[in-house]
A protein has these predicted regions:
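Short acidic (Asp/Glu) and glycine-rich catalytic loops that position anionic groups and cofactors
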Residues: 7-11, 167-169, 270-281, 366-373, ...
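ATP/Mg2+-dependent ligation/transfer catalytic cores
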Residues: 1-210, 227-241, 252, 388-389, ...
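Short hydrophobic/aromatic-rich motifs at helix boundaries and adjacent loops
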Residues: 1, 161-162, 212-217, 362, ...
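Eukaryote-specific, cytoplasm-facing alpha-helical/coiled-coil scaffolding segments in long proteins
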Residues: 324-326, 415-423, 467-476
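Intrinsically disordered, low-complexity charged/polar segments
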Residues: 408-438
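Active-site capping/gating regions of soluble enzymes
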Residues: 17-18, 26-33, 38-48, 52-120, ...
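Histidine-centered divalent-metal-coordination microenvironment in nucleic-acid enzymes
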Residues: 113, 152-166, 209-223, 257-279
Length: 500
C-alpha cells in the first residue's frame, strides 16, 4: 500500500491506490460497486460561471456503463448565451480524473466534471474547459514547457453579529478566534474541498472584517497549490461550489463578489503561475528571476487591458480596482510589491536554512525550495469565468515568448516603489492604466482579440459573446456617477452579490 495515496483525502485515490490522472472507467465502476454508491452526478460550468448538475440513479451495471461511456444530452442554449436554440443540443461526457464522493449527499453519490461535445462528437470549441485545454496545449507547443497555476480564493462570510470579541475593522488578516468568528467554517470547507480533490496550501482570515446593520462581514481565503492549469480551474470551480453549499448548511451567507461596500476590502482571486520543464520550476536561475519568467511577465504586461474581460466581469469589479485597496490600477510588475499588477512574491531564494535557525536541534535539511517561486496576477476577482481567466493568462504568458522585445517590455514596466504614494506620481503617470469599466474592458478585448484567437484558442463566437455581455452593462461612467452615493452603491453590490 502506498502511504502517500492512502493519506489522500479523496476517497477514490485512497481506495484505488492511484492518482486521479490514472483513473479509468473500470476504476470508477469498481469504486461504485464496492462502496455501494447509489447515484452519479454530472457537473459542468455554464456561462454564468457556476456549476450545473445532472443526477442519475444507478439502475444497473449496463446503465452505469452507458452513462459513463456515452454521457448525456443537454440544452446548450440554456447554458451558454452564444449557442442558439435552433441548434443547441450538446453532449456532456464525464472526465474520470475529476471523480469525487459528494460530501453533502445523504444518498451515497459520485460526482464528476464533464466536457462538452457537439453533434459531430467533437469537443465544443467554445466550451470553457476546452478553451483552457487549447491554451495550455498551445503554451507547451510554443515553449516546450508546462503552464501551472493556483488561485487564492477570497470570500466573505456574513452572519448575525453577537457583539462579542469584536475584531478590528479592516484588520482581520490572519486573525485567530474568538476575534475571527468563522475559523471552524473555513476548516470544514478546506476538509470538504480536499475530499473533492483540491490540493490546498492553507487557509486564513483576511483583511476585510466589519459590521453593518447587525451583521458581521468576515473575509476569508483558501489558497491552493500549483498544479497543471486545467486542474487548477477544476479545483477552484468545485471549491466555490463547496463553500456555498456549506454556507447554506450553516445558515451563513457567502459571497465572492469583488466589492461589498465603499471603503472596505473587496475580494480578489489572485492567480499564481509557474512554468515547469521536466518537473523543474523554470522561474528562477541562480537564485534570481529567470529570463523565462521575465518573458512570461512581458506577455502579461502587453495583454492585461483585455485580460480584464475574463476575471472582472461585472460593474462592481471596477469599484475594487482603485488605489489604496491592495488592488492594481496600472500595468506594471515588481518584487514583493502589492501596488503592482503582477507581483513576484518571496520565493525562498535565500541561502540560509531557516528551519535549522528556528530549531537548533535540527540538522541542515538541504531542502530544494526552487519549486516554490511563482508570479502573481492581482487583478482577477470572484466574478471571474475561471476557465477563460486561466486560458487568458496562458495565452498572455505564451505571447511573451513570441514577441521579440519581451525582455525590454519587462524592464520598462518594472517598478520597485509604491506607485500610489505622492512622491511616485510621475512614475504612476508613465504607466498604462487598466480599464475602469466593463465597457472599457470590452473595447480593449476587441482591440487585442486576434492574440486570443490565434491557434484557435478562443473561438470568435466566444469573444463576440464576452464583448456583447460586457458592453451590455453600459457602465462607462458608473464609477463616477455613484461617487458619494452609498445607498445606490449598495443596491449595485446586491445585484451582483452571487456573481461567478
Amino acid at each position: 500500500m502506498n502511504y502517500d495515496l492512502s493519506m489522500n483525502a479523496n476517497q477514490l485515490v485512497a481506495f484505488l491506490q492511484k492518482p486521479t490522472s490514472e483513473f479509468t472507467k473500470a476504476d470508477i465502476i469498481s469504486f461504485i460497486q464496492q462502496k455501494d454508491i447509489r447515484m452519479v452526478n454530472f457537473m459542468y460550468p455554464a456561462g454564468d460561471g457556476r456549476l450545473k448538475t445532472l443526477n442519475f440513479v444507478i439502475n444497473n451495471q449496463a446503465y452505469l456503463e452507458a452513462i459513463l461511456t456515452c454521457g448525456e444530452r443537454v440544452d446548450g442554449s440554456s447554458l451558454f448565451s452564444f449557442i442558439e436554440a435552433g441548434s443547441s443540443d450538446l453532449y456532456v461526457i464525464p472526465r474520470f480524473c475529476t471523480a469525487f464522493v459528494d460530501p453533502f449527499a445523504e444518498i451515497p453519490t459520485l460526482s464528476m466534471l464533464c466536457s462538452f461535445f457537439n453533434k459531430d462528437g467533437e469537443p465544443l470549441e467554445s466550451a470553457p474547459e476546452h478553451t483552457l485545454y487549447k491554451a495550455s496545449k498551445t503554451f507547451t507547443e510554443v515553449t516546450g514547457m508546462e503552464f501551472q497555476a493556483m488561485g487564492e480564493l477570497e470570500y466573505y462570510v456574513i452572519a448575525p453579529d453577537t457583539g462579542m470579541f469584536q475584531a478590528t475593522d479592516q484588520r482581520g488578516y490572519h486573525e485567530s478566534g474568538p476575534y475571527a468568528k468563522f475559523n471552524e467554517f473555513r476548516t470544514q470547507c478546506m476538509s470538504y474541498i480536499a475530499q473533492t480533490g483540491g490540493q490546498i496550501k492553507y487557509g486564513h482570515s483576511e483583511v476585510g472584517n466589519f459590521t453593518l446593520d447587525g451583521y458581521i462581514y468576515e473575509q476569508n481565503e483558501i489558497e491552493f497549490l500549483p498544479v497543471p492549469v486545467s486542474q487548477a480551474a477544476d479545483q477552484l470551480m468545485i471549491a466555490k461550489w463547496v463553500i456555498r453549499n456549506l454556507g447554506y448548511r450553516y445558515g451563513y451567507n457567502v459571497t465572492f463578489a469583488p466589492k461589498i461596500t465603499a471603503g472596505k476590502a473587496g475580494s480578489g482571486l489572485h492567480v499564481h503561475m509557474r512554468i515547469m520543464k521536466d518537473g523543474k520550476n523554470q522561474m528562477l536561475k541562480d537564485g534570481v528571476l529567470s529570463e523565462t519568467a521575465r518573458k512570461a511577465i512581458a506577455g502579461m504586461m502587453v495583454l492585461p487591458p483585455s485580460i480584464t474581460a475574463f476575471p472582472n466581469t461585472n460593474p462592481t469589479s471596477y469599484f475594487r480596482l482603485v488605489p489604496h485597496q491592495e488592488a492594481p490600477t496600472n500595468v506594471c510588475w515588481g518584487d514583493r510589491n502589492r501596488s503592482v499588477l503582477v507581483r513576484v512574491p518571496l520565493g525562498w531564494a535565500a541561502k540560509t536554512d531557516m528551519c535549522t535557525l528556528a530549531n537548533p536541534l535540527e540538522a541542515e535539511s538541504h531542502f530544494d525550495t526552487s519549486q516554490k517561486q511563482t508570479v502573481e496576477m492581482r487583478s482577477p476577482d470572484g466574478s471571474a469565468d475561471l476557465y477563460q481567466l486561466l486560458a487568458g493568462l496562458a495565452v498572455a504568458c505564451r505571447h511573451g515568448f513570441e514577441i521579440e522585445n519581451a525582455l525590454d517590455i519587462a524592464e520598462k514596466t518594472y517598478v520597485n516603489v509604491n506607485i500610489h504614494q505622492k512622491e511616485n506620481e510621475d512614475k504612476l503617470k508613465s504607466l498604462a492604466q487598466l480599464p475602469d469599466s466593463c465597457e472599457a474592458s470590452a473595447d480593449c478585448l476587441q482591440q487585442q482579440r486576434a492574440i486570443f484567437e490565434q491557434y484557435n484558442v478562443f473561438s470568435p463566437a466566444m469573444i463576440d459573446g464576452i464583448i456583447r455581455r460586457l458592453r451590455g452593462y453600459e457602465d462607462k461612467t458608473l464609477r463616477a456617477d455613484l461617487e458619494g452615493k452609498p445607498m445606490e452603491m449598495l443596491d449595485l453590490v446586491h445585484k451582483y452579490f452571487h456573481c461567478g
